[in-house]
């Protein structure tokens, strides 16, 4: 018989764990003594719900980062397999490599043929090592664009799922052209004729995210993050102290709410109370409903109109000031 997995608690969730332990203790005593304490249990459960709502309504950027990295947060493959009517993974960059940090393939969403792809983190330590913790190599980005071009050739919309700390920054990655591979993807994704919807499901880290992140719509889960660099790296660069990562997380404006205010994302996807890992089925339904709605809107536009709007969307990003000569 399968045993229930022990929950993985984050630091800010410990008060909730203490309250849950108290509820279980009352239940156990009630069973032992044969006493009806349903009113007391109901009150404690209400307190637990209120406390959970209070905690998750006031999360700091650093706490949202912890949720985005939660080991049990649904992955790209989890979402693809859950929202697809059919799914067939495709492999290889046609240059001799097949990076497992990027998964890609053809699928059906609500009966419509689409291409789905994204970074894939491991489900355990061994799998994480095999998938390089979701950090793609140049081969991964070349595989991604090959399959996106396949989608464009056959008129299939493209759905990308972003979940990576960053692109792989090893010496071999540089030797094989990491910067060129990402830059090529950026250019080519602007040229594609089909609708493109990108969704940040966990971590959206730096150029690693951008390599599959050019689209007509950019969606983001409520507790996902999107940044120019991991907060730890930013803190190490600016203050020579990785312990200042929480301060960097505040300064980087990594949360969905911040990015929506800045006009960088199009929609925040609400998560079940406690995060997507608490109720993956609920999170999947939210994602699927949104993707279908956006696909319907984008399919009503002509290809030239979509491409122009995609281009202008990215041209509007960023703020700069210019002083008088």
Swiss-Prot record:
Molecular function, one GO term: carboxyl- or carbamoyltransferase activity
Record's subunit section: Acetyl-CoA carboxylase is a heterohexamer composed of biotin carboxyl carrier protein (AccB), biotin carboxylase (AccC) and two subunits each of ACCase subunit alpha (AccA) and ACCase subunit beta (AccD).
Pfam family, one: ACCA
Pathway in which this enzyme or protein is active: Lipid metabolism; malonyl-CoA biosynthesis; malonyl-CoA from acetyl-CoA: step 1/1
EC number(s) reported in the record: 2.1.3.15
Name the record gives this protein: Acetyl-coenzyme A carboxylase carboxyl transferase subunit alpha
Entry-linked Gene3D superfamilies: 2-enoyl-CoA Hydratase, Chain A, domain 1
Biological processes, Gene Ontology terms: fatty acid biosynthetic process; malonyl-CoA biosynthetic process
Alphabetical UniProt keywords: ATP-binding, Cytoplasm, Fatty acid biosynthesis, Fatty acid metabolism, Lipid biosynthesis, Lipid metabolism, Nucleotide-binding, Transferase
Keyword Lipid metabolism: yes
EC top class named in words: transferase
NCBIfam families: accA, AccA_sub, PRK05724.1
Annotated function: Component of the acetyl coenzyme A carboxylase (ACC) complex. First, biotin carboxylase catalyzes the carboxylation of biotin on its carrier protein (BCCP) and then the CO(2) group is transferred by the carboxyltransferase to acetyl-CoA to form malonyl-CoA.
UniProt catalytic activity: N(6)-carboxybiotinyl-L-lysyl-[protein] + acetyl-CoA = N(6)-biotinyl-L-lysyl-[protein] + malonyl-CoA
Compartments (UniProt record): Cytoplasm
GO CC terms, sorted: acetyl-CoA carboxylase complex
Main localization, broad class: cytoplasm
InterPro entries, A to Z: Acetyl_CoA_COase_a_su, ClpP/crotonase-like_dom_sf, COA_CT_C
Ranges of residues in domain CoA carboxyltransferase C-terminal: 43-297
Family: Belongs to the AccA family.
